[in-house]
Every structure is written in C-alpha cells, then in structure tokens.
C-alpha cells in the first residue's frame, strides 16, 4: 500500500501518498515576525539606550542618564483600534536621571520616549485602523569582500576588495592603471595602497617587510615610493577625504582615529564582527598549503606540526587549538593608531600593578597662569570635577584628555598593542617534491570582540588582498546567502530608533547646555523626543517595507509575513538591479523559494522564505538537515536535526530527499544523489554527512500547496503560486480533494483562525463567542459540594459545573469576528467548528474563517472539468461554465464597501454642518430608510444615488436663483440657508447596509481637528460569478469566463452527470503544466471513493499510485470517457479527459472593471477625457487603434474620434448644440493637444503658425474666448 491515512487537526483526514519515512513538522510559520519584535522589546531598546547614555552638556556640568524603560498597557484593544481608526500602540517610557556632575545631585522622572506600535499575536501592526505588515529586508552583510575580474589587456585576473561595516566608513582596495594598487577610505579619492599602509603607523619599507614579508607583490606596491613615512601618509589620506584640505598631522591622526575606531561613528554590529573574524581567519587560507617552518610550542619547545607538512583539515584543527602561539605584536600600545600618542596622554601609572593614574605635568589656567592641579597628583573624581568646574580656562588638549566622552581609566584599560596571527606557508610543490613559492599569511586577532574595526582587521584585510595575487585565498560571491542576511522587524525598528535618537540627542545637548540644574524641575523639562516619534510614524506609514496587509485570503496573509524584499532603504534599486542579483542561487536551497516571486519589474528582488527556513541571531537564513552517522561500516540516518546557514552547508555533503532507508534507518543504496558546495552529484554513502529533512523544504508555503508541482513548467508554477494569493473568499468554501498536506498548517499559522491557548472542554458556543473551561490546578468546592477533585479525571460534567457557577478564573473566552471588512473589502466571518461538550487540546483550531474549511485552507471549489472545445467559446484560455454553479452559489463571494462622511466646523460666523433627516429638495421616498438622526438603518437595501447619511451645509450669503426662491417660499427659510451635502451611494454601487459606526466629539471619541462627527456606513453586496470574471487552477492555468451555459446545453456523462466547466485542451501542451491533467484524474478517483488525498510536492502520487487509485475507483486507465452533447444527445467523436479540478475565483472581477462613460471630466492641459473607472473616464483610442482605422480607410470615423469625441473644445460644444437642435454636425476645429504641441515648440524657440485660408488668421493662437465672440454656439 503506497499511502497512509493522516489526520490534519481534529476535523480533517487525508490519504497521504508521501514516501518519506520521517514527517518533520513545519516550524511556526510566522515566528520570524513575533520573535524578532520580542527581541526588540527586551534587548534592542536596552542596547540603544546604552549607546546614547549618558548625554552630557558641552561643558560637562550636567548629564542625562537613561536608567531603564517600560511599556504602559495599550489604551485600546486591537478590535477597538480597528473600529476607531487609530493605531494599536503602547506608550514607551524611559526612567531618566538628570545629574549635576559638580555637586552629585540628581533629579529623576519617567519621560515618554514614543508611542510604539505593538505587534498583534498574528504578526501584524494596526496603524490608523488598518492592519499592516513589515516585510523582512535582505541586504549584503557587513564583512570583508574580495572580487576578481579577468583583464583581457593584462591577460590576468585583477582583484578588488571592500571592508564594509554595518554603519561607518568603507575601506576599498582596487588595481588601477599601470598595475598600481590603490586604497580608498569612505568613498574618497584613491591613494596608493603603499601610502595607506604607511598611514597605519609604519615608518619605513623595512618595517612593512618585517610584517608583510618580502615578495614580488610587496615589491611592486612599494617600488615607486621613496621618502614616505607615517605622518606624511596620514596627512595625504586626510587631504583625499577632505577634498585637498591640509592640516597638521595630529589633526589628521585624530580624524582617521574617529572615523574608524570610534564606536559612535563606526559600527560592525555582532554580525560584522562574526563575519570579519570568519573571513580574516588565517587558518582558513592556510588549508591545503605546506608549513614553511616548524610550529613550536614556545613554552615547552615541543614541535606541534613539523615543517613542510601539508595542512589538512585535521592539521588545521590542531592549529586552531594552539592558535594563541600564532599571535605576534605588530605595534605596541604606544604606536597603535587606535590609541592616543604620548604627547596626547597627560596621565601615567607610577606602579604598573596598581590601577592609579597621576598627572604628567602641572595643569595650568591658560588665562591666569595659576596651577590648577600639580604634577604627579592622583587623578580621582574630585580632580576631574575641579577641572570640569574650570573647563573654560583649560587648554584644549587637557580638556579633551581628562573631560572627553571616555573615562581616562577606561581609556588606559583599552590602550593595547596590535596583535595579528601570522603563518608562513609554501603554496606549491614541484615534480621532485620540492616546495616553493613562500607566502606570509596574516590573520586578524581572533580574540577580538570589539564592535568597531581594529588595526589588526585592517592589516589582515590588506594581507588577504595581496595574497590573492599570490593565488592564496578566495574571492566572494556576493549573491551567496552566506553574504546576504535578513533585517527583520526588530532590527529595522532599532535602526529607525537610532535615527530618531541621534536627532533628539543634539536637541537635548543644546537644552542641557543652556540650563541650570537649580532652575529645572527634572529631566522632563530638558528632554524632547518629538524627532523619534516622527521617525517611527513615518516608518510605519510610508516605508517601502511597511505594507498594507494583503488580507484577501489566509495564504496571502501568511505569504506577506514571510516575504523577503531586497528593495527599500539600504537595499537594491529596482531600476539598477541586474540579472545576477535576481537569479536563483544554489545557496537558496531550503532558504528562499526558487519559484514564488512577482512577474513584473520586481522579479527576483521580492521572494519568499522556504517552508522550513529559520533566521539565526545574525540574520542569516538556516535550513534543517538530518545528521548522518557512520558506525560499524553502516551509514544511518539519525533523528537529530541541525539548522545550517549557507556558509556552514558549504563544508558538508548533503543527501537529497529521495534516499531509501531500510528498517534500521540505514541507507540502502551504495551511491547516493547529494549536494556538495552547491553542486549536485553522485557520492558514496560513506561520504554523506547530512540529509534533507523533507522534499518540500526547497519551496515556499504557497508553492508547496500546488499538487504535482514537479510536473509543471517553472514559470507556470510561479503563476500558480502567485494566483492562489488572489483567490477571493467564497460563500461556501471547500478544501481541495487533491491537496498536498500543507493546507492545515498554512491556515493555522496564517492568523485568520482562533487557536485554543489551553486545553479544556467547550462549555459555551455561539456565533459571537466560545468559552472553554480548563482544568483547575487545585480542588474546587462550593457550599460543601466538590466541583472538582485533583485526584480524579477532569470531565465535561465538572467543566460544566465550573462554568455554571461562574468560575471565571478557569475559563478562556474567545470572541469571534462577525461580518468584518478586510483590507481588500472582502468579508471576514468566523464560524465555530467545535460543539458543546467537545474536549479541546491546546493548539486546536476552534473556528473556520474566510477561505478555510474544517481548519484547512479552502481557496476555491472542486468542480468537474472536461478538456474540450465548445463552439469556439474557450478560445485563448477562455472558460465555459455551467449555470448550476451560479444558481447554487458555488463561486459566490461577499464584498463590503465602506462609505464615510464627516461634519466639520466651518469658518467663524458660517455655522456648522449638520446630520439630519430634513434634507432640502428631496422627496419622502429618498429618506424613507433613514432613522430619526438622518442615518441609514442597517439592513436596508440601497442602490446607486440613494442617501446613506442626510447632511446639510450652510450656504452663506449667495443670491438664490428664481426657482430656488420659489422653493424657499413654499418650504420655508431652512431651504434658503442650507444646501444638500448628503452621503449617497456612488455610481455603480449598492447592496445591503450591514452596519453603521457613529463617532462624535460629544461622546468623547478621538476625531481629527475641525471634525465634530464621523459616520461610516458599511454596505455588503453578494457577487455571483459572471462572464468576464477571472478564474484559475493551481498550475498557472488561468482564464476568463466567456459563456455561462444552461444545464441542458452542457455535455454530460453516460450516467447523465453534466460537466461543470470546460477548458481548452490547447492550453496544456504549450504551457507544459501537466500537473493539471494528473490532478483531474486523481481528483475524479478520490471523489468516486469519497476521500481526500495529500500528494506532497516532489514526494507524492507516482504513476503506479495513480493507476492503482483509478483502478480502485473503477475508472478507465487513461482517465477519459465518452461525453454526450447536451443539445443533440449525440456522443462526441472522441473520448474526452474528464476529472475533478480545484479552481479558484480571482479578485479580478468584471464588476470592478466594466465601465461606460456618458459625460465626465477632462484633463486640464490636453482637454482629453480622463481615464479609468474611478474618474468616470473614457476608453483610450491609442496609436495602434488609429492604425487600424487607417487600414480600413475610415477617414470620417477617425476624424471624429481624434477631434470632437476627444479634445476639440470648440468642436465638441458645437456638436452638442447641433445634436440638441437637430442641425447637421459642424466641421471639427483644432484639437487642444495640437495647441499644446505648438506651445511646446514655441518654448523651444520655434514659431509655428496655422493660417486659415479664408480669414488669414493664425488659428493656433485663438482662445476659447475668441471663438465665443464669433458666436460658435
């Protein structure tokens, strides 16, 4: 038997045809959103506040410390924020201390940092009443990158390098003309690499050769330099960065030090330090080279690895254990560019063992010459405060050293030398076995944890760059996922907070520098975080990564939360992105879906996470693999799972998911298909180190819901994955007969269902709420009667007793959503799928929502399909449908439109707008459905033009027309004072009024300035499927309904069953999506057997399984049958493929698009009719349509279309008059667009005239007023 029955949740069961022995459950599909936001709340804010703490006044007298932070509870619930059109936020407070440094006094208060939008449990944000999703951004990781390009002129490869931080100055290396190597700092002009090396602190070529070694490449770098030293090089480097500005060497040194080694200006972040240490590790380069000298333990003189030995992986492992012996000091603390020079250091240690600093010289008042602090005085807090008190009289060097941002004792602790790991190796061996080509490898200090770059890193990066010319080291693939990482919501928010706090810091510094401690009540008087609030608001409302949630169905919602975008700030520009960055990369395997991506200009730039993908703490995407064990000559699969990044996967040989195991989990086949370093090949089973956990781990959730995916062309699979996200929720949803097994988890994790938080029994259920009574932790008794005893099993009777006696602490209440409007104007309705008394386990699904059925994804319906033509009506993928599907609401959907009206305060003396039933100049019939306030009654049926809310607006002092005067005399004074400004049903709309929301300033509702009342009316309309609606299968097979036929005209089977849908058979071979053919055969068999099946992607029903199930269902082996013409009763000549296909109705509906224009607006400049349904625009008659009329020689029609029907202002008015008066149509005049063209030529200095032969006048310059004078009308 090639299948097993599997339960999906408590309500659904499928016959699963998966061949995989281990069914690894999918991880939580939206954890990347929730976990990242939780990290930001717990750690991200804390790290930021530490970076900005303390903020000092310019003279150092006052300091502001951020001690701690806390979130106040949200004022409104998630549901309330959606109703009131406000954001779901919590106030973020920071505990702030204002310190007077001179006296030690402090003042404390809690200050509002910002209103922080909170993430809902389903991974979304509610901003101004609408749900939004922040998508993850994929960017290049901070690291050291090297690239190589073959130069045909030089006939060799030239190299370039980039040292990229998360924030700060880049260092770049490149080869220029004349084979000279250059360096650039912070995108400045380039300087020779030799000068850049000198600038690091080297004073001579000999000193450089001592570190970098003697080699041809070093000689080529330094052969043109003679009198350069460290000081001159620093001044030159400063000059290049500052566009030629010349300064003393101390200023240049200080500038470079600040640019590179100050954490406020330069930030690698954790990921940058991890990648720097990984790339610049000397041992990574040393693999497969030969040791140039003995590697000795200097303490014991023991030879750990002998000279000339090949450095294999095992030898490298030994070196790693003893890597501290590789360290060599390049510069001592005194000559380290990161540290201050001897001249700048004004304190010293008398005793190296004690942590005490003494002044080097007398510290003098520069104005009076008075000695403020004597030489050899111990520097303590009192001395520092004394100096701070006299800061304005101190020399600049003194104040900078003693009163700088960093404590002098901390500076002393950080003052260290520069250490690098150095190893000399041979790279080549001749035929006689003699080693040659000696190379010196320099790595950075692997003990380093600093978040900024160090001199050790810079020296190692230069050496790596030079090593590339000696064929040591590797170039980087920037599209590899080891070099690209995700910025999740937590990091994106942290970056925005940093921008806001940086702006606020300057403002706070200015405030505390101009304030006195005694005159302020607390830090709240000095601190203003308006900048931060503005930045956060802008990010959530207008960032490219903050998107209006695609709420059309659960799959669309889930996919958007797992979406990965390369666009946005710090990302890729869509217009400049090449094919390489968009293309599928072998490192995407199990991490990014190779199928699901948009079809337009964003193709490849917006992708989706694969099903099992997770994101590690550095932002790199991981995918799971089973560990493979080798014991007793057997290769077995363990149940242990490791999550590997793309970099870690490089080192492994990973078996593809189609492997075969015996009863003991040992691999049966000696040769196994596996991947190594991104390439697929055949390997011995003894070489295998890991194995795929599932065949579907390569694709995303949307793609894995396509059955028989492996039989479809990739571009059609892409369309199928994308179109499922456009499926409209149907009135009666139905899960697919042919599924893939992911439908349950996709629906559960999407966020549109209610999941039980705890186990228990259902003690109350209706359409509004579900109450689950859970098991108490202790005995419960009431009036001497035991309601629950912990020694007994918890039963429904006990749960019912607890519920009836109102024990709220043992109840969990779940509120259902009833007739809500989604972001895409579709209906959101939750219905219970549990019954009273049912036992519930934690994690069970309690309701079915939009596009779900029994807890499974249900985007469409299972319909009987025949691949045949019918009178040519399914030409070009068109679909022919049975009228029965319309009658029985198979593809009917409900849509809700929102209409809004406000009453506003008018300018002083003009009165105010009113909501009223007394609307002037309308009959009783127009207001019959309004309540006493003048608002439509819910449940009323309305059509185009009907009043929804009666509203009147004061007219002001405008003289009424004679007819209005007559009405005023008859009706009264009110008609004169007010005009009708009621909210009416727009053109082409209508339906049933579903609900009305009324907000008023009097009731305490929050409304925008100047608004007194706000009324929202929601109208629901039922849309049956119609000709012109777009439908699709799951295999990229899409089409528009061309005909809806009566039941009696449709082809029928031998038993009289009519066909539901007819599809064009020509739509299959050219599109190469054979999956749909397999689906109809399997669907027909499953329907006959009364079962549902799961055929997972790459691992489902094969030919043998399909034959067997068709045989079981008594179907013909070819899946074809004789159909009869419904009109004649005659059988068709050929047997026809008939089966059951799952088809969805897409959101592209004809009701939204069908449109006709009678009268409407014109564009201002060209005076041509506006376009589109929203503007009540016309149908564009474009260039190609004009060609068609040329071809037919329809001159009069063409002249009409180009003039009086378009932008001939004079002609169209004359034509209107002629039609009204019944006179012949006049000749057209000049179109307005021609006048615009002439004006554009005039703006270029070309004077164009169009002289009329009879009047000799220039027609182009005539205005509409001139024509009116001539009396054209």
UniProtKB/Swiss-Prot annotation:
Q: Give the classification, highest ranks.
A: Bacteria, Bacillati, Mycoplasmatota, Mollicutes, Acholeplasmatales
Q: Which of the seven top EC classes does this enzyme belong to? A: transferase
Q: Does the keyword rRNA-binding apply?
A: no
**Name this protein carries in UniProt:** DNA-directed RNA polymerase subunit beta
Assembly mode:
The RNAP catalytic core consists of 2 alpha, 1 beta, 1 beta' and 1 omega subunit. When a sigma factor is associated with the core the holoenzyme is formed, which can initiate transcription.
According to its UniProt record, which protein family does this protein belong to?
Belongs to the RNA polymerase beta chain family.
Please list the GO terms describing molecular function: DNA binding; DNA-directed RNA polymerase activity; ribonucleoside binding
What keywords would UniProt list here? DNA-directed RNA polymerase, Nucleotidyltransferase, Transcription, Transferase
Enzyme Commission code? 2.7.7.6
Q: Which NCBIfam families match?
A: PRK00405.1, rpoB
């Amino acid at each position: 038997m090639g299948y097993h029955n599997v339960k999906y949740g408590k309500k659904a069961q499928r016959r699963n045809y998966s061949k995989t022995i281990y069914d690894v459950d999918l991880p939580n599909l939206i954890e990347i959103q929730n976990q990242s936001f939780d990290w930001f709340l717990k750690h991200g804010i804390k790290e930021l506040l530490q970076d900005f703490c303390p903020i000092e006044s310019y003279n150092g007298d006052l300091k502001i410390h951020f001690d701690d932070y806390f979130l106040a509870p949200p004022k409104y619930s998630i549901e309330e924020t959606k109703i009131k059109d406000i954001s779901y936020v919590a106030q973020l407070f920071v505990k702030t201390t204002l310190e007077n440094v001179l006296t030690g006094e402090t003042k404390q208060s809690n200050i509002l940092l910002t209103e922080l939008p909170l993430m809902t449990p389903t991974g979304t944000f509610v901003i101004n009443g609408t749900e939004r999703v922040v998508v993850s951004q994929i960017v290049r990781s901070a690291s050291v990158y090297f690239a190589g390009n073959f130069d045909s002129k030089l006939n060799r490869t030239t190299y370039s390098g980039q040292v990229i931080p998360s924030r700060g100055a880049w260092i770049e290396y490149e080869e220029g003309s004349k084979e000279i190597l250059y360096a650039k700092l912070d995108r400045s002009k380039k300087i020779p690499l030799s000068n850049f090396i000198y600038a690091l602190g080297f004073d001579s070529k000999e000193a450089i050769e001592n570190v970098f070694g003697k080699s041809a490449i070093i000689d080529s770098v330094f052969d043109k330099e003679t009198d350069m030293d460290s000081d001159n090089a620093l001044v030159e480097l400063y000059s290049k960065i500052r566009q030629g500005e010349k300064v003393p060497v101390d200023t240049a040194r200080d500038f470079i030090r600040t640019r590179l080694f100050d954490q406020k200006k330069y930030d690698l972040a954790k990921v940058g330090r991890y990648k720097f240490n990984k790339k610049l590790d000397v041992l990574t380069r040393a693999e497969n080279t030969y040791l140039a000298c003995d590697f000795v333990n200097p303490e014991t003189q023991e030879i750990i690895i002998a000279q000339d030995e090949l450095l294999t992986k095992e030898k490298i492992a030994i070196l790693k254990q003893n890597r501290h012996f590789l360290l060599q000091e390049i510069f001592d603390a005194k000559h380290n560019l990161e540290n201050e020079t001897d001249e700048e250091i004004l304190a010293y240690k008398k005793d190296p063992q004690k942590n005490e600093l003494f002044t080097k010289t007398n510290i003098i008042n520069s104005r009076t010459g008075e000695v403020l602090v004597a030489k050899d005085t111990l520097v303590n807090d009192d001395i520092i405060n004394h100096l701070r008190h006299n800061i304005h009289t101190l020399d600049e060097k003194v104040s900078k050293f003693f009163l700088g941002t960093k404590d002098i004792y901390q500076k002393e602790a950080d003052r260290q030398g520069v250490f690098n790991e150095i190893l000399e190796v041979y790279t080549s061996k001749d035929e006689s076995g003699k080693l040659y080509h000696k190379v010196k490898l320099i790595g950075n200090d692997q003990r380093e944890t600093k978040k900024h770059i160090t001199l050790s890193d810079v020296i190692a990066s230069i050496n790596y760059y030079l090593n590339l010319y000696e064929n040591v080291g590797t170039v980087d693939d920037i599209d590899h996922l080891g070099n690209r990482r995700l910025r999740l919501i937590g990091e994106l928010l942290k970056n925005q907070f940093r921008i806001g706090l940086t702006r606020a810091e300057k403002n706070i510094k200015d405030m505390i520098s101009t304030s006195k401690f005694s005159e302020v009540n607390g830090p709240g008087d000095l601190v203003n975080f308006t900048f931060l609030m503005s930045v956060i608001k802008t990010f959530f409302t207008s960032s490219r990564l903050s998107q209006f949630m695609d709420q059309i169905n659960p799959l669309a919602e889930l996919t958007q939360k797992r979406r990965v975008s390369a666009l946005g700030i710090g990302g890729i520009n869509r217009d400049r992105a090449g094919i390489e960055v968009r293309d599928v990369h072998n490192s995407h395997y199990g991490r990014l879906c190779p199928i699901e991506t948009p079809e337009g200009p964003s193709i490849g730039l917006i992708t989706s996470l694969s099903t099992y993908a997770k994101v590690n703490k550095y932002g790199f995407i991981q995918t799971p693999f089973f560990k493979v064990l080798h014991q007793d000559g057997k290769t077995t699969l363990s149940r242990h799972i490791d999550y590997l990044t793309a970099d870690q996967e490089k080192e492994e040989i990973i078996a593809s998911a189609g492997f075969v195991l015996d009863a003991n989990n040992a691999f049966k086949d000696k040769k196994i298909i596996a991947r190594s370093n991104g390439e697929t090949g055949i390997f011995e089973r003894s070489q295998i180190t890991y194995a795929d956990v599932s065949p579907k781990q390569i694709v995303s959730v949307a793609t894995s819901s396509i059955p028989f995916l492996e039989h479809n062309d990739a571009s059609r699979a892409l369309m199928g994955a994308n179109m499922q996200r456009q499926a409209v929720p149907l009135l009666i949803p139905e899960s697919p007969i042919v599924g893939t097994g992911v439908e349950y988890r996709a629906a559960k994790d999407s966020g549109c269902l209610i999941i039980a938080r705890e186990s228990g029994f259902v003690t109350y259920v209706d359409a509004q709420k579900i109450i689950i009574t859970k098991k108490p932790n202790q005995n419960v008794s009431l009036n001497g009667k035991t309601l629950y005893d912990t020694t007994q099993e918890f039963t429904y009777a006990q749960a019912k007793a607890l519920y009836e006696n109102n024990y709220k602490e043992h109840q969990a209440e779940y509120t259902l959503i009833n007739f809500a409007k989604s972001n895409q104007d579709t209906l959101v309705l939750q219905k219970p799928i549990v019954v009273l008394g049912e036992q519930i386990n934690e994690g069970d699904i309690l309701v079915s929502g939009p596009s779900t059925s029994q807890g499974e994804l249900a985007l469409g319906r299972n319909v009987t399909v025949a691949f045949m033509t019918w009178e040519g009506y399914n030409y070009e993928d068109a679909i022919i449908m049975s009228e029965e599907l319309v009658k029985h609401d198979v593809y009917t959907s409900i849509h809700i439109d929102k209409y809004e009206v406000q009453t506003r305060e008018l300018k002083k003396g003009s009165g105010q707008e009113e909501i009223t039933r007394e609307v002037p100049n309308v009959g009783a019939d127009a207001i019959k459905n309004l309540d006493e306030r003048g608002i439509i009654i819910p449940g009323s049926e309305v059509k185009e033009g009907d009043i929804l809310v009666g509203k009147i607006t004061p007219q002001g002092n405008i003289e009424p027309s004679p007819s209005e005067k007559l009405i005023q005399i008859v009706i009264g004074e009110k008609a004169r004072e007010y005009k009708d400004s009621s909210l009416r049903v727009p053109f082409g709309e209508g339906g049933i009024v579903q609900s009305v929301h009324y907000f008023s300033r009097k009731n305490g509702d929050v409304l925008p300035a100047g608004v007194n009342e706000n009324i929202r009316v929601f109208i629901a309309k039922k849309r049956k499927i119609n000709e012109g609606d777009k439908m699709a299968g799951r295999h990229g097979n899409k089409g528009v309904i061309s005909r809806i036929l009566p039941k009696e005209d449709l082809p029928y089977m031998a038993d009289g069953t009519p066909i539901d849908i007819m599809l064009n058979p020509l739509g299959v071979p050219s599109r190469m999506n054979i999956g749909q053919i397999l689906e109809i055969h399997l669907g027909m068999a499953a329907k006959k057997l009364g079962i549902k099946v799961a055929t997972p992607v790459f691992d489902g029903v094969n030919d043998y399984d399909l034959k067997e199930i068709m045989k079981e269902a008594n179907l013909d082996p070819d899946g074809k049958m004789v159909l009869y013409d419904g009109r004649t009763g005659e059988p068709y000549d050929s047997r026809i493929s008939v089966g059951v296909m799952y088809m969805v109705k897409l959101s592209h509906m004809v009701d939204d698009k069908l449109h006709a224009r009678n009268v409407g607006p014109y564009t201002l400049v060209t005076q041509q009719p506006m376009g589109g349904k929203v503007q009540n625009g016309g149908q564009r008659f474009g260039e190609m349509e004009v060609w068609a009329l040329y071809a037919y020689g329809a001159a009069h029609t063409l002249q009409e279309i180009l003039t009086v029907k378009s932008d001939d202002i004079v002609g169209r008015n004359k034509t209107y008059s002629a039609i009204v008066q019944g006179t012949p149509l006049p000749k057209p005049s000049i179109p307005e667009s021609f006048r615009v063209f002439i004006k554009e030529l005039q703006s270029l200095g070309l004077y164009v005239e169009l002289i009329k032969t009879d009047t000799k006048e220039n027609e182009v310059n005539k205005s509409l007023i001139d024509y009116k004078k001539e009396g054209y009308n």
